[in-house]
């Protein structure tokens, strides 16, 4: 939407202030983000959740009562976050690749 100041600046041949340009671009980005997210309906999220659980359940036993799937938005990026507590692998034990991050997790699991 063009303000009176923008109209006068345009008629006088002045450039639009960078703040106004930045604001207009931000509004377009926000509108674009809202449109993209609106396509993720509850039914679609439920279907994705079920399919993810079906695939993971082929390899590990999941604690279905503790499963949490959510959408999280940060810095204009939306992520599907799935917290799937694993009881054990299908063959009976949980195996981890040893890394700094999993080192503590392995110690906690063995307790």
From Swiss-Prot:
UniProt KW keywords: Cell cycle, Cell division
InterPro entries, per the entry: MinE, MinE_sf
Record Pfam families: MinE
UniProt-listed Gene3D superfamilies: Cell division topological specificity factor MinE
Domain of life the protein comes from: Bacteria
Coiled-coil parts of chain: none
GO biological process: cell division; regulation of division septum assembly
Primary role: Prevents the cell division inhibition by proteins MinC and MinD at internal division sites while permitting inhibition at polar sites. This ensures cell division at the proper site by restricting the formation of a division septum at the midpoint of the long axis of the cell.
HAMAP family xref list: MinE
Similarity remark: Belongs to the MinE family.
The protein's name in its UniProt record: Cell division topological specificity factor
Gene: minE
């Amino acid at each position: 939407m063009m303000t009176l100041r923008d109209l006068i600046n345009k008629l006088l041949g002045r450039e639009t202030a960078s703040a106004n340009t930045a604001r207009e671009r931000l509004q377009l980005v926000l509108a674009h983000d809202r449109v993209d997210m609106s396509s993720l309906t509850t039914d679609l999220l439920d279907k994705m959740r079920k399919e993810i659980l079906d695939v993971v359940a082929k390899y590990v036993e999941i604690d279905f009562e503790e499963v949490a799937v959510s959408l999280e938005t940060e810095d204009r990026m939306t992520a599907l976050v799935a917290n799937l507590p694993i009881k054990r692998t299908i063959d009976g034990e949980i195996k981890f690749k040893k890394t700094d991050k999993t080192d503590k997790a392995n110690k906690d699991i063995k307790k």
